[in-house]
Amino acid sequence: MLQFLNRCSRGRGAWLLMALTAFLLELTALYFQHIMLLQPCVMCIYERVALFGILGASLLGAIAPRSPLRYLAIAVWIYSAWKGVQLAWAHTMLQLNPSPFNTCDFFVNFPSWLPLDKWLPAVFAASGDCSERQWQFMSLEMPQWLVGIFAAYLVIAVLVLISQFVKPKRRDLFGR
């Protein structure tokens, strides 16, 4: 399995597939926001940024999958997936244990050199409450689904990282 993951990480197909999944999840978030009119909260926006980090990592890996740039893509992938798990878990705890003393921020806090909420308010502006339960599918809230999604991204990323230390088998037609 590790040799298979090593081979996949050296080709563009797996990186582009990951980019497609992250992009479709972003489109789903925008559908919930603009079509279903669910108001994203601050934690939702941060989770969206973590997903954009995974999308960026996959595009970085697809640019040059056989070069050392692949290692930077794996590092960004792991970091973004880990932050996504942390954010989604904290968001889940806010929803499962609502308290007036335990709330999320009222406004997103992006760095002054990267004010995403000012540049793209349709994507990064927060207007909802983190503890409000707005959507449910198969008895799980949206942050609970995101815990599973980010955890899957993280497990696969760690396996791909481990596979980088496994030498791929040479595929020789005559078995030499």
From Swiss-Prot:
Keyword presence, Disulfide bond: yes
Membrane topology field: Multi-pass membrane protein
Transmembrane segments: 15-31, 50-65, 72-89, 145-163
Keywords noted in UniProt: Cell inner membrane, Cell membrane, Chaperone, Disulfide bond, Electron transport, Membrane, Oxidoreductase, Redox-active center, Transmembrane, Transmembrane helix, Transport
GO MF annotation list: electron transfer activity; protein-disulfide reductase activity
GO cellular component assignments: plasma membrane
Swiss-Prot/TrEMBL GO biological process terms: protein folding
Principal location listed in the UniProt entry: membrane
Protein location: Cell inner membrane
Cysteine pairs bridged by disulfides in the record: C41-C44, C104-C130
Keyword Cell membrane included in the entry's annotation: yes
Residue ranges annotated as Periplasmic topological domain: 32-49, 90-144
Annotated InterPro entries: DiS_bond_form_DsbB/BdbC, Disulphide_bond_form_DsbB, DsbB, DsbB-like_sf
Stretches assigned to the Cytoplasmic side: 1-14, 66-71, 164-176
Pfam families per UniProt: DsbB
Family assignment from sequence similarity: Belongs to the DsbB family.
Function: Required for disulfide bond formation in some periplasmic proteins. Acts by oxidizing the DsbA protein.
Protein name, UniProt field: Disulfide bond formation protein B
